[in-house]
């Protein structure tokens, strides 16, 4: 069975690739989890973030946006000293701001799914990826979404982070053409 080259790095990567990456997400909780994980990934390997994922879920109230929106200074400081956390002050302090912005956006559009797919007219983007070198780091789409999200109060949400997010939640299918997951939406 052929799979994308990056998925061969570890068991964490393979499992994530085979079961999640590029599969269409419809659940707001999952969207928020992926926004957090992609934000934490900046400057780190995705494999490292996947290894920390279970611990992050434990200390971040299972990625519950309503709970994270209420985090105060004491909670943020405790996260910075927790070994399960990715200890980057900017990333940790962006959590409650992003949670509040996420909840406001969901209230405005009815769901994050409705918001994100308005940028693609309700359609998935399926790219022609012959090999890993063909995969872009960002796109005009991720630039537009990043810009809009920043206007809405999100932090630590650049075009590269958003592109990775869009891949992860299935808005963009960047599986290599020969990968068995290419074109699978759910």
Predicted regions and their residues:
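HhH-family (HhH-GPD) DNA N-glycosylase catalytic core used in base-excision repair
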Residues: 1-186
């Amino acid at each position: 069975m052929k799979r994308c080259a990056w998925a061969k790095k570890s068991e964490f990567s393979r499992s994530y690739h085979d079961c999640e990456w590029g599969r269409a997400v419809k659940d707001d909780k999952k969207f928020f989890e992926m926004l957090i994980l992609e934000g934490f990934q900046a400057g780190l390997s995705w494999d490292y973030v996947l290894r920390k994922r279970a611990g992050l879920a434990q200390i971040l109230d299972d990625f519950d946006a309503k709970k994270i929106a209420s985090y105060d200074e004491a909670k943020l400081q405790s996260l910075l000293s927790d070994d399960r956390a990715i200890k980057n002050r900017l990333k940790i302090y962006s959590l409650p701001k992003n949670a509040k912005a996420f909840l406001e956006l969901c209230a405005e559009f009815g769901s994050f799914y409705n918001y994100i797919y308005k940028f693609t007219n309700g359609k998935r983007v399926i790219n022609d990826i012959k090999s890993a070198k063909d995969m872009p780091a960002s796109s005009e789409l991720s630039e537009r979404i990043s810009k809009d999200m920043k206007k809405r109060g999100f932090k630590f949400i650049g075009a590269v982070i958003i592109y990775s997010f869009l891949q992860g939640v299935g808005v963009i299918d960047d599986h290599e053409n020969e990968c068995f997951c290419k074109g699978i939406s759910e």
